């Protein structure tokens, strides 16, 4: 039923209204004439409700979060990364308008991280993530390939160039390398709030990466 209103919910021009609808629904401030006013959340929402963050990787998303007075999560892992990211986040801070939800700008940065005992091992594990990304943007998504499949894959020159560019926005390495890069990114984005996204073929490697980062 939610997708039936409005008639074309996936069109970007409806997105700001959908955010307003969500905020109104969570805070129980929708007008009586609103189509969603009679819908009740389950479990019920009392005095508190989840924080609403706007995730994005472009200036438009940052400006929307700023104008609505919402926290902004910058998706460093989407690809714009280090070249545009800090400027986009600074634009959000500069244009932030206080709201009932937030009195001052709040920033989180999402980063691809793969940590292993050695840099060589981390880069090897990351090859399956990189291939998965390549296949995803070229319409050939098939999940996360094994490291063996990734290393035996026949890459064209343009695909190799893409992989090199994509990996620059990822933090892969041994524990000390990862720590140094995360601290550097936190400083450049002027935030201590980082979200780590770890994508690799084997669960054990993903778990070990998280354990090493936590140490």
Residue ranges and their predicted role:
Residues 45-51:
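A local structural motif
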Residues 78, 113-115, 200-202:
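Active-site-proximal loop/turn and secondary-structure-junction residues that shape catalytic pockets
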Residues 1-6, 69:
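Acidic/polar active-site rim loop that often engages polyanionic ligands
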Residues 8-41, 83-189:
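An alpha-helical appendage that flanks or caps ligand/catalytic pockets
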Residues 180, 186-215:
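Generic C-terminus detector
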Residues 58-89, 93:
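A conserved active-site cap/scaffold subdomain adjacent to cofactor or substrate pockets
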């Amino acid at each position: 039923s939610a997708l039936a209103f409005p008639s074309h919910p996936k069109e970007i021009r409806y997105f700001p209204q959908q955010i307003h609808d969500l905020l109104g629904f969570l805070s129980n401030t929708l007008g009586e004439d609103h189509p969603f006013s009679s819908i009740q959340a389950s479990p019920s929402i009392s005095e508190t409700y989840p924080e609403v963050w706007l995730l994005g990787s472009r200036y438009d998303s940052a400006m929307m979060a700023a104008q609505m007075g919402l926290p902004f999560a910058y998706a460093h892992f989407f690809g714009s990364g280090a070249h545009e990211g800090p400027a986009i986040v600074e634009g959000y801070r500069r244009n932030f308008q206080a709201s009932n939800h937030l009195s001052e700008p709040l920033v989180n940065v999402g980063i691809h991280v793969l940590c292993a005992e050695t840099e060589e091992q981390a880069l090897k594990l990351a090859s399956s993530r990189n291939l998965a990304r390549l296949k995803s943007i070229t319409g050939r998504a098939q999940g996360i390939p094994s490291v063996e499949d990734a290393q035996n894959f026949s890459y064209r020159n343009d695909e190799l160039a893409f992989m090199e560019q994509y990996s620059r926005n990822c933090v892969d390495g041994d524990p000390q390398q990862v720590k140094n890069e995360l601290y550097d990114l936190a400083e450049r984005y002027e935030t201590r709030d980082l979200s780590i996204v770890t994508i690799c073929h084997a669960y054990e490697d993903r778990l070990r990466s998280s354990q090493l980062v936590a140490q």
